[in-house]
Amino acid sequence: MGSSRLAALLLPLLLIVIDLSDSAGIGFRHLPHWNTRCPLASHTDDSFTGSSAYIPCRTWWALFSTKPWCVRVWHCSRCLCQHLLSGGSGLQRGLFHLLVQKSKKSSTFKFYRRHKMPAPAQRKLLPRRHLSEKSHHISIPSPDISHKGLRSKRTQPSDPETWESLPRLDSQRHGGPEFSFDLLPEARAIRVTISSGPEVSVRLCHQWALECEELSSPYDVQKIVSGGHTVELPYEFLLPCLCIEASYLQEDTVRRKKCPFQSWPEAYGSDFWKSVHFTDYSQHTQMVMALTLRCPLKLEAALCQRHDWHTLCKDLPNATARESDGWYVLEKVDLHPQLCFKFSFGNSSHVECPHQTGSLTSWNVSMDTQAQQLILHFSSRMHATFSAAWSLPGLGQDTLVPPVYTVSQARGSSPVSLDLIIPFLRPGCCVLVWRSDVQFAWKHLLCPDVSYRHLGLLILALLALLTLLGVVLALTCRRPQSGPGPARPVLLLHAADSEAQRRLVGALAELLRAALGGGRDVIVDLWEGRHVARVGPLPWLWAARTRVAREQGTVLLLWSGADLRPVSGPDPRAAPLLALLHAAPRPLLLLAYFSRLCAKGDIPPPLRALPRYRLLRDLPRLLRALDARPFAEATSWGRLGARQRRQSRLELCSRLEREAARLADLG
C-alpha cells in the first residue's frame, strides 16, 4: 500500500473530498458512505470485516468541515485511527472523536441511539458509564447513531515494559503470530497451538462490523501462551462469528484473527438458536418479538401454526414479519399460543411461540344446543367479528362447509357478549370458530354433543331390557311359597357287586339329578371314588349321612336280591346298614328296587316298613316323594329337548336293568 508517510498524506485529502461531496450531495459508489477505517496493527482473514489497511498515524492533522460537524485525526505514535462519515441514511450532524493513546488498559467507545420501537412495546436504553480495571466502556446515547454501528476495542498487555527488550515489528512486514487450532466439540473448547516465538495473548471473540466482541462471562478469558505450546479456550456456543484472535504482548503489534466457522453448517444449528435471546412483546392484534443476537446476521421471520406441540409448525401464506433493528412485527394477528414465529437463516430454522400465554386469549366461546340449532356464546374483551362454519370429520381443520356464519359488534361498551345461532348440519359434524376481523387467526374446533336428543329412546330401551332381565331371573330363581328354602340333597346307597349293576346305579343317579333340578345334589359313592378311597367307605358314609341330616335331605336305599341275607343270620355286612337304619330318622329313609333284580320277598323284614318304590314303574311317585314338585319338573323338563333327554335316560336305565338281570341269571 506504499509507505506510511504517503498514506498519512493521502488520508486527509480523501476525507476532504468525501466531506465536500457529502455537502454537495455527491456520492461515490465505490467508497463506503458510512465509515472509513485506518486500523493500525490489525490483521484479519475473516470475511465479516473485509480487508484492513495499515496506516500509521504519525502527523498532526486537523480538518474542519463546512458542515456543523467536523473530522479530526490526532497525531499518535501507536494508535487506532477511525473516521466516520455522514451519508444520506447514515450519521447526521454528529461530532465524533476517537483517540486511543498509549495505555496499559484498553478503551472502548460505543455510541447508541434510542430505538424506534413498534408500538406499544418500548425499549429504553439509559446512559451508563462503567469503568473497571480491565477496560474502559463509555456508552453515550445518541438519536442519530445506530446501535449496530460503532464498536471499537483495544487491548494492551498488563505489563508492556517487560517487552521493551524485544524488537519492534513493522505491521506491514509481519502478519501477527502464527497459530493453528482444533475444535473439541465434546469439551466445548478450541485448542490453539502457537508457533515458535515469543509469548502470545490468545482469546475468543465474536466478530462484528468494527469490533471483535469478547464472549460473555465466564468465557471471556484471555490467556498468555508461550511459543510452541497449546492452550484450550472454552466457548459457550459454536457460532459462525466465533473467532480466534492472537497477538504479541508488546504494544501495537499486529493481531492475527481467524474466523473459520462461518462456512460450517454446525455453526448454524442448535447452538446458534440457543444463543439468541427472544423477548415477546405481543399484545392486542400485534405479534412482536425482539431478538438479541451474538452475531451480525439478519434473520427472516414468518408466521406458522401448529396443531399440537408434537407436530411441525406449518407456514402460513403471505405471513412474513417486518423487521426493524432486531424487532420482528406482524400486524392483524389473533394472538394464540399455537401461532408462532419461524425464524430462519439459510437452511436452519427455529420456531418461537409467544411466551405471554396467560394474557394472549382475548376472547372465548362456549356452545349450547336447542332443538335443531347450535348456539355459540362469544365473550370478548374488545370489539371484534367472529365467524363459524361446519367442518366434516376427516377433512382437516382448514376445510369448511359453506355457508359461513358471522356476527360482529363494532360499537358499545366492553367486554362484548355475542350469540351466533347456526342450524345443525348433521350428526357427527364439528364447527370451526375463529376471529374474522384479523388477517391471521387460529380456528377453534368444537364438536357438539347431541346424544341427549335420543335420551328418551335410550331410557325406553333400558327399561325394556331391565324388564326382560327381571322376568328371566324370576323364572329361573323362583322358589315355592311353602317348604324350606335351601335345596335338600339325596344320598343314594347301594350294594352293587358287578360292573353292570354299578352302571345301572350311575344311570339312575343321573336321572334323579336331572329330574330333581333346582340345584338338588345327588350323593353317590361312584361319583366320589377318589374321596372314598382316601378316607375309606365307612367314614365317607357317616360324613354323607351327617350332611343329609343337617340339610334335611333324604336317604334313598337301592335294594337288590343279593344285597343282604336274612337279618337273623350272622352276616357281618349287615352291621353298618343296621346301624344306619337305627341312627337315621324314619322319614328320611326311602327304599327303591328294580323289579328284574329284586322281588318283594327279597326285602328283609326290617326294611319292609319303609316306603317302597318299584323302578321304573313308580319313578314319578318317587320323584314326588323326593320333593320334586311340579314347578321343578316344569323348569327342568319344560326346556327345549328336555323330554327327549329324559326319555333317553329312561331307556338307558331300562336297558342296563335287563343287562344286569341277564348277567345275574348267568351267575
UniProtKB/Swiss-Prot annotation:
One of its GO terms (cellular component) is cytoplasm. The chain crosses the membrane at residues 455-475. The keyword NADP does not apply. One of its GO terms (biological process) is inflammatory response. Predominantly expressed in mucosal tissues with high levels in keratinocytes and colon epithelial cells. Very low expression in dermal fibroblasts. Expressed in various tumor cell lines. Residues 476-667 are cytoplasmic. Residues 487-624 form the SEFIR domain. PROSITE patterns: SEFIR. Residues 1-23 form the signal peptide. PANTHER family: INTERLEUKIN-17 RECEPTOR, INTERLEUKIN-17 RECEPTOR E. This is Interleukin-17 receptor E. It comes from Homo sapiens (Human).
